[in-house]
A protein has these predicted regions:
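N-terminal glycine-rich anion-binding loop in soluble enzyme alpha/beta folds
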Residues: 1
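Short, well-ordered amphipathic alpha-helical segments that serve as non-catalytic structural scaffolds
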Residues: 4-16, 114
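Short beta-strand-loop/turn "lid" adjacent to the catalytic site in phosphate-handling enzymes
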Residues: 13-58, 76, 84-95
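Gly/Ser/Thr-rich loops at beta-strand to alpha-helix junctions
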Residues: 30-33, 135-141
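Gly-rich Lys/Arg/Thr-decorated short loops/hinges at beta-loop-alpha junctions or inter-strand turns
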Residues: 48-49, 93-98, 214-222
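Glycine-rich phosphate-binding loop plus the immediately following alpha-helix
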Residues: 60-68, 79, 86, 94-130, ...
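Adenine-nucleotide phosphate-binding core of ATP-dependent small-molecule kinases
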Residues: 192-229
């Protein structure tokens, strides 16, 4: 994945006649330790954490690729608003089971970027506004932004919120517990159901929302029923 994605980026730059002569390189962040929103310089500790991350996701490659390109350009490399931005208020961390605490993993980069863009469009600063921001993609984030901080948001990676093209979202806990102890599945398989093979993929065998939406608009089932849900 690393070489493929890096070479893809370099090929696109070459095709667009953009020389490797940058003042800085910035990338999407990865699944690092929880951190407030902001821009962070890429260093050896960050790269080590990404290479040894507990959770796998393509976003873990962003900083590594940016750092390599930046070295060729002799310029600094950064990430901005990684998926692990954690600005939750204390009450948002609590669940009905004391041993389980909610964590903040969401599409922070896009959510904060569109918030700033919207704020600018109405002549305001992001830090002045209270917003509900929704990201729709392979996963779905629904976040409460209070004066520039995301004080509550669903865990868009590991089983909260609406189901999405590849993720199961919030599901009945009792039925999940029964599934886990049914003897039919390993822990790895259950986790894949929650993230990777859940949602539209589980129901329809594909994550191509364009195709699914077209079939649904034509009234074809089960595409219409699942997409409406």
């Amino acid at each position: 994945q690393y070489e493929y994605r890096k070479n893809f980026i370099l090929r696109l730059l070459a095709e667009a006649d953009i020389p490797l002569d940058f003042d800085a390189v910035i990338a999407r962040g990865g699944l690092l330790k929880p951190t407030p929103g902001g821009v962070y310089a890429i260093n050896e500790q960050m790269k080590h954490d990404l290479l040894n991350a507990r959770m796998e996701h393509a976003c873990n490659l962003g900083a590594l690729i940016a750092d390599e390109i930046a070295r060729e350009c002799h310029c600094p490399a950064y990430i901005a608003d990684p998926e692990v931005v954690d600005e939750l208020q204390p009450a948002a961390r609590l669940t009905g089971i004391p041993e389980i605490e909610r964590i903040s993993i969401f599409h922070a980069l896009n959510s904060k970027a569109v918030s700033r863009k919207y704020a600018a469009s109405i002549g305001k600063h992001y830090e002045e506004l209270n917003l509900i921001v929704v990201h729709l993609g392979g996963g779905i984030s629904v976040g409460a932004h209070c004066k520039g901080r995301v004080i509550d948001v669903n865990n868009a990676l590991n089983g909260e919120g609406p189901f999405s093209p590849e993720r199961a979202g919030t599901i009945p806990a009792d039925q999940l517990a029964e599934l886990c102890f049914s003897g039919k599945y390993t822990l790895k398989q259950i986790k894949k159901m929650l993230n990777g093979k859940g949602g539209l993929t589980a129901h329809l065998g594909m994550n191509d929302v364009v195709t699914i939406a077209r079939k649904a608009s034509e009234g074809e089932e089960p595409y219409k029923g699942v997409l409406d849900a």
